[in-house]
Amino acid sequence: MNSPSDLAGASLIDALFGVKLSQHARLITIASSQDSALPQALVAERFTGREAVNELFSFDVDALSTSTDLDLTSFIGEELTITLLQPDGSRRAWHGLCTDAAWLGADGGLARYRLHLQPALALLGLRRDSYIFQDKDARDLIGELLADYPQVRHSFDVAQALAVRPIWTQYRESDLEFLQRVLAAEGLSWRFEHDQEGDEPAEGGAAQARHRIVFFDSQAALPATPGGDTLRFHGVRASDTDDAIDRFAAQRRVAANAVSISSWDPAQLMAPSAEQLTSLDIGEMPSLSIYDGSAERRHDNKAFADAHSRVMLQALELDNKQFEGAGAVRRMAAGHGFTLTQHDSYADGDNSFKTLWVEHEARNNLEPALGEALSRLTGLAEAGAATLLQFSDE
């Protein structure tokens, strides 16, 4: 027998939506990336997410349904798409594999589920192996490693020469840990890009994800922030036609500022070496050098030693000066560049930045009546939308 609260909740939902919950004209939507039907009609209530350079993205989506017993296994491994309405009326999409699905409770005929989305690259963290790769550079090694994961799309934007190594050793570590170690050793970074409406479908068809990982080096030109590379420093108002950053502040840290490396090569009876000293303004700090001579046959010649020492120094310099901000910018993307305008402290020529990480928070624009019902039936408090950002100008 239904309780009075169940009947009241069902009546309210029917009055607001009819038979099914609707995603029509919502700020946030959720759907299957491959056009397969979800188990039941779902409405995205809210989501939080983080995407960063050299990091797996992660999104948690709270979704509502009139069904209280959805089969959670039907979500696992499914690629889902979140879209967020932009100021110009277009939609920005993120695609991720559902790696965790949970039922959070139900009351009054309305159930809440939480879906955790990650990139297909997260699958590499689930396989552990020991393996020897011979006579390969990093690009060839990565291609061989990812060949075992047809879901993972990848591309390279690398101009620097990559040394062919006689042996790469994966030892009792996951494929993801090994991949990250190889990339770090070569000074390569990575970011994710998501297919948007109108993009050509992936060549691999439905077997491949609708997001891809891009491996890039320090010489690569970062793409502009989606929707335009100019962002305003301005108060956030509901009547504005574009989003804005309303908090932006610099921070500096003490860090090592020099690198010295060498690597013994018994075939040449010598140790190719290199040194690098930062050219950044580090205040009154003395030279603080990191020396690394641990690896054998790491560099065939001084040119490769110089290149390796440069990327090591660039990694140290990244922490020298960064910026953090917040606002209501719905199009921020990690690994993309932008120009900040209307800020008194950053004039033209000194206002270009690269986004290192961004945290998203958004809640759907549900009707006031349903918002009150959710607060009453499930104890939710009202929350706004915000974005936390981190940038670098180096």
Q: Where are the predicted features?
A:
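Amphipathic alpha-helical and helix-coil boundary elements used as assembly
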Residues: 1-394
